[in-house]
């Protein structure tokens, strides 16, 4: 019943969000095209509920990489000024309202991570896939990208184990000042978010 209520809220929020922000979506699309070139909407395969992959939609915030200049360490040089501003204000996330409408993500939950991370989690970190990934979550109101991986994943597991509707409402409310204050957008060295290390000790991922 609670999950059904969450889904109803997601659909209403997505539909209302797409309607209200349609002029902003158009303006952001034009600005992205002028600053980053072709491919206004960036599609990346992410891990969803139970580890099932889906395509997350975002506005492109970086120029296409030059040969040999790919990876998080080159984020700063590829980031456009428009993209930097949109990422700081989370406007690059607006296209993900379509993912919300389709039920691939929810308003509150662990952030969806790239599919190639599946083998890199340790032990109970896989509990984060027991719920749909979210637009915002416990880690996002406690440091966002500035939080290191072990702490960030611990926040995700804590959320899954303790989530309530009241807790979701608190996270949504606290997301507003976190976004407006543009806190935790990048890590200390200027990288948006370092890769989750591939050599973490583990017993192996569960079967999807």
Residue spans for each PLM region:
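A hydrophobic, helix-centered structural microdomain
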Residues: 1-65, 99, 171-208
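Short, hydrophobic secondary-structure boundary micro-motifs
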Residues: 28, 43, 70-71, 108-110, ...
């Amino acid at each position: 019943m609670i999950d059904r209520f969450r889904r109803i809220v997601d659909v209403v929020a997505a539909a209302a969000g797409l309607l209200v922000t349609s002029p902003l979506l158009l303006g952001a699309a034009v600005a992205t095209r002028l600053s980053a070139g072709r491919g206004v909407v960036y599609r990346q395969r992410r891990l969803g509920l139970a580890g099932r992959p889906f395509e997350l939609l975002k506005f492109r915030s970086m120029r296409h990489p030059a040969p040999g200049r790919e990876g998080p360490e080159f984020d700063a040089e590829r980031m456009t000024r428009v993209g930097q501003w949109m990422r700081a204000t989370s406007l690059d996330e607006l296209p993900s309202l379509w993912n919300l409408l389709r039920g691939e993500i929810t308003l509150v939950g662990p952030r969806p991570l790239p599919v190639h991370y599946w083998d890199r989690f340790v032990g109970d970190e896989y509990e984060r896939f027991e719920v749909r990934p979210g637009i915002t979550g416990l880690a996002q109101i406690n440091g966002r990208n500035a939080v290191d991986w072990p702490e960030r994943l611990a926040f995700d597991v804590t959320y899954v184990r303790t989530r309530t509707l009241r807790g979701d409402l608190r996270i949504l409310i606290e997301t507003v000042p976190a976004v407006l204050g543009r806190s935790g957008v990048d890590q200390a060295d200027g990288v948006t978010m370092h890769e989750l290390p591939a050599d973490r000790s583990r017993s192996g991922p569960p079967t999807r």
